[in-house]
A protein has these predicted regions:
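Contiguous segments within soluble domain cores/interaction surfaces
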Residues: 1-19, 118-121
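Well-ordered beta-strand positions in beta-sheet-rich domains
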Residues: 14-16, 25, 64-66
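Signal that preferentially marks extracellular ectodomain short beta-strand elements
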Residues: 23-40
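Extended, polar beta-sheet/loop recognition surfaces of beta-rich domains
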Residues: 40, 52-88, 92-94
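Hydrophobic beta-strand segments within extracellular beta-sandwich modules
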Residues: 45-46
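Alpha-helical protein-protein interaction scaffolds
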Residues: 81-161
Length: 161
């Protein structure tokens, strides 16, 4: 599910997507190419639910994240225009903190349902980038969620090559 944060109330549902799960890395494009997707300058809330047992919904795995969609900075676009391949593009995106774009480029280099070497490295880098956010000033629940996400990223990076 993708929701848009609405300042004056309840998050607005933007898209609900159902997928048939398969082993390994699954790539999802929530919007058709011709459809306008998430808008720069807006903040969204993503929720992924994996139904492990249809008869036991309390056992579902749930993860959530907030993302802010930003306009592509001109300096990043300029570097991308000069990039020779997907490895360079993935690194440019990662250096700019555009992790979804970076992973999208990395997956172009990997076998189907695999993360690949570049993708694995990116996830490890993302885990390092997330680590400073576990500072003691955060509420325990938020800090624990970030710590869990970091461990999950490391585990995926090591197992899905």
């Amino acid at each position: 599910m993708i929701y848009e944060w609405v300042p004056s109330g309840k998050p607005k549902e933007v898209r609900k997507i159902s997928l048939q799960s398969s082993p390994g890395i699954m790539k999802l494009s929530p919007f058709p190419e011709k459809e306008l997707g998430l808008q720069p300058g807006k903040e969204y809330f993503l929720q992924v639910v994996i139904h492990c047992d249809p008869d036991n919904p309390s056992g579902d795995l749930v993860d959530e994240a907030s993302i802010e969609v930003v306009k592509m900075p001109a300096s990043v676009q300029s570097k991308l225009n000069r990039a020779a391949n997907s490895v360079e593009k993935a690194n440019i995106y990662a250096e700019a903190g555009l992790w979804y774009n970076a992973l999208d480029e990395a997956l172009k280099l990997a076998q189907v349902s695999k993360l690949g070497e570049v993708g694995s490295t990116l996830l490890k880098d993302l885990a390092k980038w997330e680590a400073p956010k576990t500072i003691p000033e955060l509420p325990p629940k938020q800090r624990e969620a970030i710590e869990k996400r970091i461990e999950n990223l490391k585990q995926i990076a090591d197992s899905a090559r």
